[in-house]
Amino acid sequence: MGTQRSMFIVSFLFKLFLFLSVHVRAQRTTTNFAFRGFNGNQSKIRIEGAAMIKPDGLLRLTDRKSNVTGTAFYHKPVRLLNRNSTNVTIRSFSTSFVFVIIPSSSSNKGFGFTFTLSPTPYRLNAGSAQYLGVFNKENNGDPRNHVFAVEFDTVQGSRDDNTDRIGNDIGLNYNSRTSDLQEPVVYYNNDDHNKKEDFQLESGNPIQALLEYDGATQMLNVTVYPARLGFKPTKPLISQHVPKLLEIVQEEMYVGFTASTGKGQSSAHYVMGWSFSSGGERPIADVLILSELPPPPPNKAKKEGLNSQVIVMIVALSAVMLVMLVLLFFFVMYKKRLGQEETLEDWEIDHPRRLRYRDLYVATDGFKKTGIIGTGGFGTVFKGKLPNSDPIAVKKIIPSSRQGVREFVAEIESLGKLRHKNLVNLQGWCKHKNDLLLIYDYIPNGSLDSLLYTVPRRSGAVLSWNARFQIAKGIASGLLYLHEEWEKIVIHRDVKPSNVLIDSKMNPRLGDFGLARLYERGTLSETTALVGTIGYMAPELSRNGNPSSASDVFAFGVLLLEIVCGRKPTDSGTFFLVDWVMELHANGEILSAIDPRLGSGYDGGEARLALAVGLLCCHQKPASRPSMRIVLRYLNGEENVPEIDDEWGYSKSSRSEFGSKLVGYVSSTSITRVSSTSRISQ
């Protein structure tokens, strides 16, 4: 019994010993400190060279003398390695510090400073200038250094030899003054992680630096930003996998700072506050609060060449004043000319949606070529932005005569009353000299033509089937509004992919009413001008030239087949899309017409329906074509599609004859802009 009790006591004492030893060891191997100023902490910072702790609590690494170095290390080594029977890893650690660099002058600055992991709390015989108080010419690049430094560099290149220094950058250095990785000094905007904000290390203002090393992933994050921001950017400047660090770090390392100046290139380097943590879970660097630190040093950078600068400023200001006077003269003359040129004529008073030319000139940045987003048969289209409005598209038209201006403006003003979700909205117009300007809503995704052909050719992105089918139904809805639902009948006369614009939600907008005509209900159209685009024009137009809603239906049918097949309606007069699809239909192979770029990514029922409706719309007899209301019911599945009768087709010879009659009589307009969209499938 006594023996068992003795064994129990021995076992208990042994376990207690193990627990206490592990606890003490954990405390001994964990390092945490925070210096919010260095007054009262002189014994904890080992300084060498030009470094000193000033009475105001600032740690100054160097003054602005030439060719000096300064180092400041925490007085105790930090245990950074974890060893077990299988491997060796580096413990997680983090550090944050606020520093200030004040150059001697704007042209005399350098060289920078480092945060360093070193096997010793000093850097014996370290060189100045490009060596930054860490290395010298003899040991530079020596793997026996066991030094890792994060370099804050302010000098481009070196006066002694060619180096990798790019100036105002952060670098990661392993045993060498040559950086393995360099990044120009920026911080990332928290509202837009892709937006970079640059700043200067030697600005004389406090800058916060945060370093975070995750031992589990071997990832090192480095973040720098002006301390005045008061918050930490969520995206670091450097986020780098650094397995090479394991070759550098020894069992115990010293942490601290080094700095140097060069010959004729010198800055004062200060550290206002510093915190460090290692040995626990992955630590997050503490952001130091600027108000809790000593005041920053005064920025006493010398103003060189003051007298010459004053002279230069006087000359420059005189030149600027002269230029401003000349510009003011021309501006007054320009305003005077504008006032004379914008006199209203009698016919313009009835159309109150007139915009000022000067506003459109400013909105389009002077109608520069860089603002062109498309061209068409009636003019050029520019992107613009009026104050307090969404972007606009401005079409600049040059009419052939003053009579043409009157008729065209009256026509456009009537069309400007059209309002439908599948039509491009006309906001207004302007007349300036012989130019007519039409102002539309700006549609960001460009034309259906570009999405069907240009975008796939450039990027390989193919318009998805679902997007195509919804676009087809949207165009049909817009044409139904023009033909039946507005107070007058509107015949578009130029329905084609380049006149269909796609908005940000992939809704189609039928636009470019340059050829459109209005008719009172119950009247017949009368025109002798044959207009439209080859491939989309109904066959009866070659006989009488009179457009009708049925000729718009024909053009829609061709457009619908083009959307499904991904092919142009005609090719050099040898291929006709409508005849090709009809031939496949007659052979029972109509699904072979579907755009092969879709692969299997389409709905067979919807595709078969769309092809059948397209063929019905292309019937050679206008009276046999369905109205747009019936077309929309077909596409929505609200009515069954009838069989195509034997009188549908016409021969290729008649088609060729029809095409030859059109040569020389056809105009074409389009607004084309290429843009990517999330609804385009790869």
Curated annotation (Swiss-Prot):
A Pfam family it matches: Pkinase
Effect of a null allele: Slight enhancement in abscisic acid-inhibited germination. Redundant with LECRKA4.2 and LECRKA4.3.
Known catalytic reactions: L-seryl-[protein] + ATP = O-phospho-L-seryl-[protein] + ADP + H(+); L-threonyl-[protein] + ATP = O-phospho-L-threonyl-[protein] + ADP + H(+)
Taxonomy, superkingdom: Eukaryota
Subcellular location field: Cell membrane
Topology within the bilayer: Single-pass type I membrane protein
Gene Ontology CC: one annotated term: plasma membrane
Residue stretches spanning the membrane: 311-331
Residue stretches making up the Protein kinase domain: 367-641
Positions that bind ATP: I373, G374, T375, G376, G377, F378, G379, T380, V381, K395
UniProt keyword list: ATP-binding, Cell membrane, Kinase, Lectin, Membrane, Nucleotide-binding, Plant defense, Receptor, Serine/threonine-protein kinase, Signal, Transferase, Transmembrane, Transmembrane helix
Catalytic residues of the enzyme: D494
GO biological process, one term: response to abscisic acid
Stretches assigned to the Cytoplasmic side: 332-682
Single GO MF annotation: protein serine/threonine kinase activity
Region (Legume-lectin like): 29-277
Extracellular side: 27-310
InterPro entries: ConA-like_dom_sf, Kinase-like_dom_sf, L-type_Lectin-RKs, Legume_lectin_dom, Prot_kinase_dom, Protein_kinase_ATP_BS, Ser/Thr_kinase_AS
Entry EC number(s): 2.7.11.1
Protein family (similarity comment): In the C-terminal section; belongs to the protein kinase superfamily. Ser/Thr protein kinase family. In the N-terminal section; belongs to the leguminous lectin family.
Role summary: Involved in negative regulation of abscisic acid response in seed germination.
The protein's name in its UniProt record: L-type lectin-domain containing receptor kinase VI.2
Gene name tied to this protein: LECRK62
